[in-house]
């Protein structure tokens, strides 16, 4: 009987179960969206039990629709929206509050207090991260400070904390395993990425009892088995876990030092594998753990662009320039250039390397001759310019020359964007045959742990190229265009 790996891709707006075969090919995808809660401006929450319900639903759909029996699943891998925080009662299994999502800014005041107390350097030195509401630690503190009775329960050892991977493993194992992996732990603001353990000083700063925290395990590891009543009477190994961006790096087979992937989703997330050394950034990048596997931990540099695919959605829904996001390519290629127009899509501030939350979106270079085509092209070009900002920072910090950029995510189907990306970077861009690299990464991690795949070299051989975009632009034109972008960003930042 043929065996498969099931990957659970628990994202910000939907949960998906993707079944992969031994060749790393997709056999079936099941997806279910769930509700977003916005209780106050800037707050984003999920119901953790609704997420759990969506997981059970997609597992059932994936197996029934594909005709695969539960006993044919050799292992389960989990990849998840990172930083999103769940706190639950360890006796009842009931969350004490909604899951606070990575995007949510409700712990901004806590972050401000930590900065005012001078903790920035300590936190940066130990975690590789910035003090920002984005990360889990201040979200946990917010729950303990604002939910009645929560702090007392936590001090008594009755509450558990977890990122989404921890919550799902706990639920799937029937409460037997309270664990996380190195990649998810490294996003909490509480984990020392050098000592590889929860840091007592950081826990003290945040006021989080150690008893709440999950045990940290490798990213490729059998954590527990599913309880039979959650998996059609079968005990299946839960064998891999990684945060979504780290899973994508693994799914792209970026196993060697200096290999880089960029995911074009709502925003862009670029990660560079830096091997067994954690590089401290001088250019606004985060230092993070890529994964723990084969008895060692490997690190990555990470850069975040806040607005990428959402800029294309803005053209479609806000400005009504087209009805389908795919049409953006058709309009962009009609214009020979952006004709001096620059769009700075800083709708929620700018991420790496600027970290400027006060700047807002701006458009420069408009003339009477500017057309819809110019505007659409300029918006797409902005995604490529922002990616160059991040890659340049990575090259500066690492001292590693980048030979190629591997790409994934929804926007990579846009050939114009990928072409321009290669041109402006002066680096070839490689688009893989399988675009579901996040789910594939967690499947690989689980498959390695249960012996479904033998080693990373077998996985590396499975990576297949769909298209390679070679840079063709002259150096002079590249410099001129990018200088214009930098001027536009500076002007937008001056307008506050």
Swiss-Prot record:
InterPro entries: ATPase_NBD, Carb_kinase_FGGY, Carb_kinase_FGGY_CS, FGGY_C, FGGY_N, Glycerol_kin
Annotated residues for binding of ATP: 12-14, 266, 309, 313, 410
Pathway(s) the chain acts in: Polyol metabolism; glycerol degradation via glycerol kinase pathway; sn-glycerol 3-phosphate from glycerol: step 1/1
Catalytic reactions of this protein: glycerol + ATP = sn-glycerol 3-phosphate + ADP + H(+)
Pfam families linked: FGGY_C, FGGY_N
Protein name: Glycerol kinase
Positions bound to glycerol: 82-83, 134, 244-245
UniProt subunit comment: Homotetramer and homodimer (in equilibrium).
PTM description: The phosphoenolpyruvate-dependent sugar phosphotransferase system (PTS), including enzyme I, and histidine-containing protein (HPr) are required for the phosphorylation, which leads to the activation of the enzyme.
Enzyme class (EC, first level): transferase
Family matches, as PANTHER family: GLYCEROL KINASE (PTHR10196:SF69), SUGAR KINASE (PTHR10196)
Free-text function comment from the UniProt entry: Key enzyme in the regulation of glycerol uptake and metabolism. Catalyzes the phosphorylation of glycerol to yield sn-glycerol 3-phosphate.
Species of provenance: Bacillus licheniformis (strain ATCC 14580 / DSM 13 / JCM 2505 / CCUG 7422 / NBRC 12200 / NCIMB 9375 / NCTC 10341 / NRRL NRS-1264 / Gibson 46)
Family membership noted in the UniProt record: Belongs to the FGGY kinase family.
Residue positions, PTM Phosphohistidine: 230
GO BP terms, alphabetized: glycerol catabolic process; glycerol metabolic process; glycerol-3-phosphate metabolic process
Sequence positions that bind ADP: 12, 16, 266, 309, 410, 414
Regulation: Activated by phosphorylation and inhibited by fructose 1,6-bisphosphate (FBP).
Assigned keywords, A-Z: ATP-binding, Glycerol metabolism, Kinase, Nucleotide-binding, Phosphoprotein, Transferase
The UniProt record lists the keyword ATP-binding: yes
Annotated positions binding sn-glycerol 3-phosphate: 12, 82-83, 134, 244
EC number in record: 2.7.1.30
A GO term for molecular function: glycerol kinase activity
Taxonomy, superkingdom: Bacteria
GO cellular component labels: cytosol
Designated gene of the protein: glpK
């Amino acid at each position: 009987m043929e065996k498969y790996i099931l990957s659970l891709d628990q994202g910000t707006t939907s949960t998906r179960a993707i079944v992969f075969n031994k060749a790393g090919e997709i056999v079936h995808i099941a997806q279910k969206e769930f509700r977003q809660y916005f209780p106050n401006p800037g707050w984003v929450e999920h119901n953790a039990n609704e997420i759990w319900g969506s997981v059970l639903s997609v597992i059932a759909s994936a197996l029934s629709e594909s005709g695969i029996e539960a006993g044919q699943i050799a292992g389960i891998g989990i990849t998840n929206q990172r930083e999103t925080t769940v706190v639950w009662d360890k006796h009842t299994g009931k969350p004490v509050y909604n899951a606070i999502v990575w995007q949510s800014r409700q712990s901004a005041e806590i972050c401000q207090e930590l900065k005012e107390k001078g903790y920035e350097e300590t936190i940066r030195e130990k975690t590789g991260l910035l003090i920002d509401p984005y990360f889990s630690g201040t979200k946990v503190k917010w729950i303990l400070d604002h939910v009645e009775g929560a702090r007392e329960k936590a001090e008594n050892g009755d509450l558990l904390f977890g990122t989404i991977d921890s919550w799902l493993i706990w639920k799937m194992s029937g409460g037997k395993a309270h664990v996380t992996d190195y990649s998810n732990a490294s996003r909490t603001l509480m984990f020392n990425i050098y000592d590889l353990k929860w840091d007592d000083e950081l826990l003290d700063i945040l006021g989080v009892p150690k008893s709440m925290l999950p045990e940290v395990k490798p990213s490729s590891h059998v954590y527990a088995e599913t309880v039979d009543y959650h998996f059609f009477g079968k005990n299946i190994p839960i064998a891999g876990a990684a945060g979504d961006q780290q899973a994508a790096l693994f799914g792209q087979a970026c196993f060697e030092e200096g290999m880089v992937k960029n995911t074009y989703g709502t925003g862009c997330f670029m990660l560079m594998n830096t091997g067994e050394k954690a590089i401290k950034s001088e250019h606004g990048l985060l230092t993070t753990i890529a994964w723990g596997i084969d008895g060692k931990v490997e690190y990555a540099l990470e850069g975040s662009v806040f607005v990428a695919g959402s800029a294309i959605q803005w053209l479609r829904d806000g400005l009504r320039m087209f009805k389908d996001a795919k049409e953006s390519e058709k309009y962009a290629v009609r214009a020979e250039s952006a004709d001096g127009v620059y769009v700075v899509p800083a709708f929620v501030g700018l991420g790496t390397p600027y970290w400027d939350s006060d700047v807002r979106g701006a458009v420069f270079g408009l003339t009477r001759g500017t057309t819809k085509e110019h505007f659409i092209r300029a918006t797409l070009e902005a995604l490529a310019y922002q990616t160059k900002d991040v890659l340049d920072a990575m090259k500066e910090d690492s001292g590693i020359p980048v030979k190629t950029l591997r790409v994934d995510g929804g926007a990579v189907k846009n050939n114009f964007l990928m072409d321009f990306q290669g041109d402006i970077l002066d680096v070839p861009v490689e688009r893989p045959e399988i675009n579901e690299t996040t789910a594939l990464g967690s499947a690989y991690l689980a498959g390695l742990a249960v012996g479904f795949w033998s080693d990373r070299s077998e996985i590396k051989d499975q990576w297949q190229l769909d298209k390679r975009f070679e840079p063709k632009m002259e150096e002079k034109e590249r410099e001129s265009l990018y200088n214009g972008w930098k001027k536009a960003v500076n002007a937008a930042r001056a307008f506050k």
